[in-house]
């Protein structure tokens, strides 16, 4: 843990030192669902697993649904952070994502842990810092790829006041929204480029492309 009591950059209205606190002092945890292969079906209750977490986002990937009558764990809530706590791949331990909107009929799997806090956007940003990665590395089991509740209880972080937490959380929420917006623009441009590459070059057997700049009408020549 660093001895610095304040960050190098902060909003100007805040001057108080950050306090060193245990993770369990400012978050609560909830467990995932244990199910059997016979509980799985084509639809029902969605069970979020490590495959549903990618780059800090919840994604549709290798979705698993179980019969609703076997569900004995609570539904995820908006703001919850779900964390991979056990996996065959050591590098996936600690991977996490925040639930950005209400997801009905959705729980987490047994190899996940849910985290709730008073300021989830700040907590999510905190878990994105290198310090959280360091805490995971220090507390992870030597032979089993997992983080237990006891290991979480040993983790410590510097924490600001709740008002500063909210300001920081809002700042990173806005950054995430901006990144998402530009990502969508990027994906659209990639699709435009792919389409233009297909239409601005002649297809097999054709001498002119489907789309070309006006002012050009000559056939394209076959050349080596």
Residue ranges of model-derived segments:
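A short glycine-rich beta-alpha junction/loop motif
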Residues: 3-7, 106-110, 141-166
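Extracellular/lumenal glycan-associated surfaces
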Residues: 7, 166-178, 182-185, 221-223
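Charged, alpha-helix-forming regions
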Residues: 10, 139, 197, 204-212
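Non-catalytic DNA-recognition/assembly elements of restriction-modification systems
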Residues: 10-32, 212-224
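DNA target-recognition patches
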Residues: 36-67
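A short beta-sheet element
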Residues: 49-50, 61, 67-130
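Extended intrinsically disordered, low-complexity coil regions enriched in Ser, Thr, Gly, Ala
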Residues: 179-194, 202-205
């Amino acid at each position: 843990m660093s001895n610095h009591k304040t960050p190098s950059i902060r909003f100007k209205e805040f001057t108080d030192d950050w306090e060193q606190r245990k993770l369990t002092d400012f978050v609560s945890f909830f467990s995932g669902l244990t199910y059997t292969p016979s509980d799985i079906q084509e639809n029902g209750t969605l069970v979020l697993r490590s495959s549903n977490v990618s780059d800090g986002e919840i994604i549709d990937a290798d979705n698993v649904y179980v019969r609703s009558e076997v569900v004995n764990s609570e539904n995820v809530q908006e703001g919850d952070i779900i964390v991979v706590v056990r996996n065959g791949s050591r590098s996936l331990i600690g991977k996490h994502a925040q639930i950005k909107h209400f997801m009905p009929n959705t729980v987490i799997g047994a190899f996940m842990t849910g985290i709730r806090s008073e300021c989830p956007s700040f907590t999510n940003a905190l878990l994105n810092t290198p310090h959280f990665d360091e805490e995971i590395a220090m507390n992870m089991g030597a032979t089993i790829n997992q983080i237990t509740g006891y290991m979480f209880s040993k983790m410590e972080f510097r924490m600001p006041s709740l008002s500063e937490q909210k300001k920081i959380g809002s700042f990173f929420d806005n950054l995430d929204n901006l990144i998402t917006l530009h990502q969508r623009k990027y994906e659209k441009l990639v699709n435009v480029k792919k389409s233009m590459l297909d239409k601005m070059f002649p297809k097999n057997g054709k001498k002119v492309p489907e789309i070309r700049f006006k002012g050009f009408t000559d056939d394209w020549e076959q050349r080596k």
